[in-house]
Regions:
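Bacterial Sec-dependent N-terminal signal peptides
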Residues: 1-27
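Non-catalytic cap/lid and distal C-terminal segments of serine-dependent acyl enzymes
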Residues: 24-26, 31, 37-64, 69-370
């Protein structure tokens, strides 16, 4: 097993201290810090480039705004105030999109590489780093016979996992969305801190969280027709990923101690895998997901489903572009008589990681309580 173990409190602390000195003509150095979260929850963005003709910032809470060039070629703008949370943003420099070079906190994604600003406010958020025991996060590589290649996965172990070598734990397989990498539920969704806080409060069971990459096509060389290989994500998940996790971590290997779910595409993947493998999973979670009613034979025996599924949890925001599909799926389950738990949010951000974090916090409290 190859892994890099990260102590997440140190990781976040180092990110908050980022500061860079930039050289100027004549040997002068100017310290530029960005972003700066002000006491009124406004945010000042700074970017140094004396040669740029136009610089914009594009941030989730304010949209795209022009920045003003000041002394020493530092472009700046102050936006907000914004509600406390984590927001992705980027700079657009003469038409080219870049991350903030002063900020080490970034959003891992196939299609874009945004930076992240964390507005904390007076009240601690569900993902806040609190003075509680913290778990560990492992970056791992495993060999997939299905792919004929190596895959990536991130694993969270709860506080005191290493200090209790005889103790075994339930497992929650948590899948990120379309274009997201395996890192997103750690770096943006802050699954580790959410679970640390819930466990410390006694609001959730101790559990291992496994965060795989949901898009196996990215493992293959360009031009490979991955789709002709069939549903290789599910095949790898069942035949390669799960055995790897269970041989390297102290997991309780039965359906009553396995949960599966995810955000967006990951929620649909999780439901499809869970519903077609109820011999392996009994807790199912879908966060802001496109959900399918086209699973042959799955929904036919309602009594069997209700007896086998300990928790069928569905969450979506009313402003999410997938709200219509998610609501139709909920109505479909209700008409069938399939028991489920629903959670709705009312917000202006729609299909975002604000909701993904909130849904994880709500559903994790209900896992492994049977």
């Amino acid at each position: 097993m190859n892994f890099i173990r990260k102590k997440t409190v140190l990781l976040l602390t180092l990110g908050a201290l980022a500061l860079q000195a930039s050289a100027q003509p004549g040997g002068r150095f100017v310290q530029v810090k960005s972003p700066v979260v002000n006491t009124d929850n406004t945010v000042t963005f700074n970017y140094q480039n004396d040669k740029a003709k136009e610089v914009l910032v594009d941030v989730q809470f304010a949209g795209r705004k022009a920045m003003t060039k000041g002394e020493h070629g530092v472009w700046t703008v102050t936006l907000g105030p914004a509600a406390p949370d984590m927001y992705p943003y980027c700079f657009i420099v003469d038409g080219t999109t870049i991350m903030d070079p002063q900020n080490p906190d970034w959003f891992p994604n196939e299609g874009f590489k945004n930076s992240i600003v964390d507005i904390r406010g007076d009240k601690e958020l569900i993902h806040a780093v609190k003075n509680v025991p913290h778990g560990s996060v492992d970056y791992l590589t495993y060999y997939s016979k299905t792919f004929g290649l190596y895959g990536n996965v991130i694993v969270y172990t709860p506080p005191f996992y290493d200090q209790n070598p005889e103790k075994k734990y339930p497992v929650f397989y948590l899948i990120s969305g379309t274009t997201d990498t395996e890192e997103v539920y750690f770096k943006v969704g802050r699954a580790n801190f959410i679970l640390d806080n819930l466990i410390a409060e006694g609001a959730a069971k101790e559990m291992i969280i496994v965060m795989p990459y949901g898009n196996p096509a990215k493992y293959f060389p360009a031009g490979t027709n991955v789709w002709e290989k069939g549903d290789i994500f599910s095949k790898d998940f069942i035949n390669d990923l799960m055995p790897f996790v269970e041989s390297n971590y102290r997991t309780i290997n039965d359906r009553d101690h396995r949960a599966i779910g995810g955000f967006s595409r990951g929620g649909n993947q999780g439901l499809a895998l869970g519903l077609t493998n109820l011999d392996k999973f009994s807790y199912l979670c879908s966060y802001s997901s496109f959900t399918s009613m086209e699973l042959p034979g799955v929904y036919d025996n309602v009594d069997s489903l209700n007896n086998q599924i300990h928790l069928f949890w569905l969450g979506v925001g009313t402003d999410d572009f997938l709200y219509g599909n998610a609501k139709d799926y909920m109505d479909f389950l209700d008409k069938k008589g399939i028991k489920n738990v629903k959670e709705f949010t009312n917000d202006k951000f729609g299909h975002t990681w604000m909701n993904a974090k909130y849904f994880l916090d709500k559903s994790a409290r209900l896992l492994f309580n049977e």
